[in-house]
Amino acid sequence: MEQAIQSVQSFFKRKDVVISAHRYGIDAMGAMAQGLFASLLIGTIIKTLGQQLGLAFLVTAGGYAAAVAGPAMAASIGYALHAPQLGLFSLIAVGGAANELGGAGGPLAVYLIAIIAAEVGKLVSKETKIDILVTPAVTILVGVSLSALFAPSIGAVASAVGSLIMWATELQPLLMGIVVSVLVGMALTLPISSAAICAALGLTGLAGGAAVAGCCAQMVGFAVMSYKENGVGGLVSQGLGTSMLQMPNILRNPRTWIPPTLAAAITGPIATCLFHLEMNGPAVSSGMGTCGLVGQIGVYTGWIESGKAVTAFDWIGLVLICFVLPAVLSTIFCEVLRKKGWIKEGDLKL
C-alpha cells in the first residue's frame, strides 16, 4: 500500500501536479482574474468607449472580447498550472462550456472545472503514442462532462446570492442600502458575475443605486488602498477593471477585504437615503461599478431617458458615492488595520 502511494506521488511529481492551496488558490485564481480582465472587462471598456464616441468598430471589437471570457479564463488557469500545449489549447472549449452552463456563477464554474480538466490533461499528456488525440480529447471530455454535471449547480449558488439580494431590496432604504451595497460589492470581487446577477434580478431604482455604490467601494477602494504596492497600473486595472484581481490576496489574508466592505456599508445607505441615487439605466450596469465607467454611464443614461432634471446635487452625489468616499474611507480603514498589524506591507501586491 505504501509503495503504491509512493508510486502515485512520484507520478504526480513527474507530471507537475501539485495539489496545494497556493497553486490552486493563489496562482490559478490570480491567472483567472487576468483572463477575465483580458476579455470581458477590457471588452466592456472598449465597447463602452465605442458607444459614447459613436464608433461602431469599437462596439463590435468589445463585444467579441467579452464573448470569449470563459475560454480566456480557462486558458489563463491552464497557463498558471503549467498545462502542456495540447491541454492548454483544449481548455478553451472547457471554459466556454463551463461559463455558459454556469450562468451567473460562470466564472466560479470555469475556475473549479478548468483546474480539474487541466490537471487530468497533464496526467495523460505524452503517455501514449497518439498524444495529439488523447490529451485534447481527455481534457475536453472531462471538462465538458463536469460542466454539464456541476456548472448549473454552481450557477445556483450565485442565484442564491441573488435571492438574498432580492430579500434585501424589500427592506427600508437604510438597511437595504447597507445590505445590497455590501452583497453586490462582494459578489463583484468574488469569482461570480455581479453584473449577471443584477441583470437577472432586474436590479434598478434605489436598489440599483446601492449596488453601484457597493461595486465602486470595492473597485475604487482596493485600487486606492493598494496604490503604494501597485502604482498607476494597479490603480487603473482595479479602478477601471475589476477588484477580483485581489482575490488571491484576500485568500492569503481575508482581513484585506475589510476596508472596502466597510466602505460599501457606509456609501450604500448614503446613496439611498441622502442622494436617492437610482439606477434607471440597464440593470446590468448596477453590477459593473467603475468598470469602464459603465455604472456611472448607466446612472447618467437613466437620468436622461427618464426626463429627470439633473441638478448639481445629483452630480455631487454620483462623484462622492462612486469615487471620493470609497477612496477616502477605504484608505482610512486600511491605515487603521495596518497600524493594528492586520494588513502588512505587500499584502495587496498584485
Question: Model-found features: residue ranges?
Answer:
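Pore-lining transmembrane helices
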Residues: 2-350
